[in-house]
Structure formats: structure tokens, C-alpha cells
Amino acid sequence: MQVSSLNEVKIYSLSCGKSLPEWLSDRKKRALQKKDVDVRRRIELIQDFEMPTVCTTIKVSKDGQYILATGTYKPRVRCYDTYQLSLKFERCLDSEVVTFEILSDDYSKIVFLHNDRYIEFHSQSGFYYKTRIPKFGRDFSYHYPSCDLYFVGASSEVYRLNLEQGRYLNPLQTDAAENNVCDINTVHGLFATGTIEGRVECWDPRVRKRVGVLDCALNSVTADSEINSLPTISALKFNGALSMAVGTSTGQVLLYDLRSDKPLLVKDHQYGLPIKSVHFQDSLDLVLSADSRIVKMWNKDSGKIFTSLEPEHDLNDVCLYPSSGMILTANESPKMGIYYIPVLGPAPRWCSFLDNLTEELEENPESTVYDDYKFVTKKDLENLGLTHLIGSPFLRAYMHGFFMDIRLYHKVKLMVNPFAYEEYRKDKIRQKIEETRAQRVQLKKLPKVNKELALKLIEEEEEKQKSTLKKKVKSLPNILTDDRFKVMFENPDFQVDEDSEEFRLLNPLVSRISEKRKKQLRLLEQQEQLKNEEEEEPEGKPSDAESSESSDDEKDWVEEVRKQRRLLQQEERVKRQEQLKEDQQTVLKPQFYEIKAGEEFRSFKESATKQKLMNKTLEDRLKLEAKHGTLSVSDTTVGSKQLTFTLKRSEQQKKQQEAEKLHRQERKKLRRSASHLRSRPRRGRPFH
């Protein structure tokens, strides 16, 4: 057993426990249960609740007594009696089952849809009848009032098979190329089918006419969803008379009210996997939606996640046991999953003891019985010299190797290599020495802000300590230990923005200066070494070489700066193009603002000035108006006050008119008359 908790909701996995190897005999299994406490405490809720390889579908009968599951290989169906907690019967089939439906309250009437177009009917005694449909089927539903089976599949038609008459009826012609899923509302009998184009078509079985179409593909696309292909309908489920849940192939679940063509809620699984099944839990108003990776339980009104269930293997089908907190899963593994969530509801009547056992479950996962065995390959047997044991009871063939007892493996390992302990001891000593060495050179904990700058300063400090010219190099205080620069490594406001334009343009210069400083330190060290060796003249580079080297460095730095500037210009162009595209896509709409009564709107620029003016007292505002000349207050002989104010607009017009008048006068003064210039008389005949 395993206990997990998500959002403070405990989930008990009843199928996760010690798994016994298949090649163990019954006698050894019983002996192992007596010896091993973990195996003895293992809870096997239903005996042999598994398939040989894979389980594809799982359902519960209406009376809740029988659990039916189909799987492979070979294709088969298994029926489990919950009252006996064991397997009731098993029937092998000719081909794999796509889906099946239990028509009766118990297991006496079952219909199977196979992947080779066959429809198989089973009764309580076994196989009853088999027929075929024209196209490959994917899903079917049973209409109880008319005894009709509706089959959908790789065709635009919905085939109808009447079980009372025993013959096919006229099919329903849909507008889709193919249909994936279908369902019938148990309240009013509405038939719905999900198409490959992402639409849901609803039909009235009484008149065999289409009564509505929902375009779910368009409604499933939200701002947060990333969809690369057209969503198709992969799951469909009715709840009551008016609610319907639709699952898409891109991982969205849409909740609809049949009276509206817009979804009430769109829930995204965020995995991009097709929704396998959808179920409703009415007591807590939850929706259980499952894809091949996870089962999510969320509130159908708000979409808030309640809890989730993520098994080890991929999911093929999910079944919610009615009126309880038990969930059954069909997985891509031999074991079928049984999960119990006490918050969803009580344990079923046939396993009411789970309520007491769940209080004693351990939260740590259990180890498997395979820990008592060691898996070895044929090459390992050759190295150990145990090839002669192949075929004996000491080795059990499994996949590409063998299982052998772990105690036997340790004994043989010790005999083959008696010095293994000494080698192990030496390896441990070497690891300890390496750990101590690593601790000596371990750097101090870097600050939260400007980590790269701090690491650079630490490296420079280490280089100074390693250099032999400690006396000649002037010792500078360390910035990391200086309190004046303490804020630079603590306050996020002082974080160096490496993406800024200033940093990218100055970074080549800073790196070039640091490289020059390192070269100078190396040259000084070489000169010191030469002096210590008492050489007459230290060899060095000629001045021409140094000048050429400095010029090359300068050229490299200039090229680096030009490169950074080109990159910045390119990024700026890309940003402008993106902004232009966004501006073209956005549609500008006029915005309206309500102006208070008694106020006059001039421009948005005066809003700040007006706000400051309103904050002042009445006396200050009167003084300000009198100063500008727009307001004058005088006393009358009667003792009252006379107030005169001038409109700003008329005042501005007067000023403008006076300015124009002065301008005309200046132009008139500067104008020179041309009346003194007269044209000379022309010679020759006048031109007529």
C-alpha cells in the first residue's frame, strides 16, 4: 500500500504493494508469507485483479457487485465478484476489445465492440451472437427506450442496430468525416456524437433529426493554450438534463450548458494529451478528467483543482465506483489500479473494512520482494564462474538475465574476490581525502546580489595571493569585506544589468583592461625570476613589439565594441518591427472621460496644474487670480464686494491681436518703396 497527499487530500493506493514473482510456486509463496512480515501485511483487495499484459477498459455493473475488465494478450474479459473478492469467470475473445457496455444490472447481458468491426453479444452462460458493422467502430451507446445501439467510427454515418427486431435501421448521416465518441443523456434521451473536426452534433432519437451543433474546437483555444493542430473530440459525458462535458485531443475539458453554445468553463490539463474519460462526482460537485498520464479532480463551477492522481504507468480507462470514494483504473501494465479517497465518499459495502485500515497505513512506500534476489546477466555469471548453474533451481531465467538469491551472490562474490573489502576500504579513504581537499579550496558563500561580480573579485584576490610579487603590487582593500560597498551585494537595486546597452558597450573595454593587467603581472613575475637568477640583462620584448601588441589589442577592442553596437542596433530593429506588428494588430478605440459639471476641458496637460490649484485654499487661489489679472475685487459704497473676472480665452485673443498689430507696424516701417524706379522708353516699333 501507498499513501499520498495532495492539497491535504489523502489518496490510498490499494494495488501498490509487494509483488511476488510469477515463477514462485504456491508452496514457496505461502512460506514467504509466513516469514516476510511485509508480504503477510500486504492487502490484496481482489484476488488476481490483473491482466496478462495490458488492461484496456474497465467498468462496474449497475448493481455494483461485478467489475468487468478487458485486456490482452490473449484478448479476454474478466469478471470479478466483489462479494467474494475474487475472479468469477474469464472468457477469451477472438480479437481485442475497443469498448464494451453492460446492458443488464449484472453481467448477464454484455456487448463488445472489437477492433475488427465485429460486435459480440454475451449472455450469462457465455458467447451468444456476433455480427459486423460496415466501418471500423470507435464507440457505441445504448438507447434503453427504443432498444437501439448507436455505433460511431471511421465513417460519417451513425449505425443503428435494434436489439428488439434484430436488424439494422437507417443510419444517421452526420456532417463529419469521422466520429470518435458518443453518449446518450439518460434524462431526456438526447444523442450526442463527437467528430474529428472538433464539433459535437446532437440528435433527437425520436425524429432522427439533428437538433444542434457545437463548435468545441474554436472554444477550446484560450490565450494560455498552445495548440499546433485542430482539436478533435476524444471524450463526451452527460450529467443530468442540461450539463455536458467534452474532452479534446489537445488536453482541454469544456463544460457546456445545453441551452448555450458557449462553454461555461474550459479546463486545460497542460500536458497536450488526449482526454481519455470524463466522470462527474455529484456529492462534491467535482469533475474527474483523465488523460494517459494523470487523473485530475476539479470543481465544476470554479475549475479549482481538488486533487490529482498520477499512477506509475499510462492510463487507458478510469472508472468511478458509484456512491463511494473508490477509483478503478486500466493501465498499460498487468496490474489494474485501485485507489481509495475517503474525502470523495465512504468505502463500498463489500470492503467497508478499508475505513479502519486506512488509519494504520504507512506513508513510506514499500519495497518489493525482488530485493531478496539479485539480477545477473550471462556475462556476470561468466565473471563469477557460475555458468554451470544455468538451468538449475538456483537461477531463474528472466528477460535477458537470471534471478539468483542475494545471499548466494554475496558468498560467491566474496570467494571470487577475497580482497574486495580492502579495495572498498581504500576507495573510502581516497574519497575522504578528496573531500577534505575540496573543503580547503571551497569558496565562501556568494552573496544574493551581483554573484558574478563577487566571484570575479574572489578570483582576482586569489591571483594576487598566488603571485610572488606581493611587495611590489599595491595592496587594495577588498570590496567584499568593505562596509562601504556592503549594500551593493545586498540591495537588488544595485544589480548589474548585463543586458543593458551601457554594459554591453563597456564590457569589451573592461575585459581588455583586465587582460592587460594580467599580462603585466605575468611580465613582472618573469622579470623578478630573471633577477633572482642573476642574469645581466633581462630578456624582454622590444618596444616595437610592445607597441604593435598594444595596437593589436586596441584594434581587437574596437572591433568588439563595433560588434556589440551592431548587435544592439539589430535588436532595436527587431523590437521596432515587433512593436509595429502589434500596433497594426491592435484596434484603437476612442476613450471617453466624464467632465465634472461647471468645469471646462482644455487639455490633459493642465490636469496636474489644476490638481495643485484645487489643493490650495480659497485665499491663495484668489491671490493667484488677481496676480494674473483675471480677477479683481473692489468694495462698493453700500459695503458689499464687487468681483470682476476676465475669461482666459478672450485675454489670449487680445494678446494675439496686439501682437499681430505690432508685427504689421514693424513690417510697414521696414518696407522700402519702389515708386522712384521708372522704366526707360523702348526703341523701335511698338508691338501690336
Curated annotation (Swiss-Prot):
Basic residues bias: start-end ranges: 664-688
A single cellular component GO annotation: nucleolus
GO BP terms in the entry: maturation of SSU-rRNA from tricistronic rRNA transcript (SSU-rRNA, 5.8S rRNA, LSU-rRNA)
Keyword Phosphoprotein: yes
Keywords: Acetylation, Coiled coil, Nucleus, Phosphoprotein, Repeat, WD repeat
Subcellular location: Nucleus, Nucleolus
Stretches assigned to coiled coil: 423-476, 512-589, 640-673
Segments for region (Disordered): 528-561, 570-589, 644-688
N-acetylmethionine found at: M1
Alphabetical list of Gene3D superfamilies matching this protein: YVTN repeat-like/Quinoprotein amine dehydrogenase
Start-end of Basic and acidic residues biased regions: 570-584, 648-663
Modified residues annotated as Phosphothreonine in this record: T481
Matching InterPro entries: Beta-prop_NOL10_N, NOL10/Enp2, NOL10_2nd, NUC153, WD40/YVTN_repeat-like_dom_sf, WD40_repeat_dom_sf, WD40_rpt
UniProt biased composition (Acidic residues): 546-557
Modified residues (Phosphoserine): S25, S475, S514
Family classification: Belongs to the WD repeat NOL10/ENP2 family.
PANTHER family on file: NUCLEOLAR PROTEIN 10
The protein, known as: Nucleolar protein 10
Organism encoding this protein: Rattus norvegicus
Gene assigned in the entry: Nol10
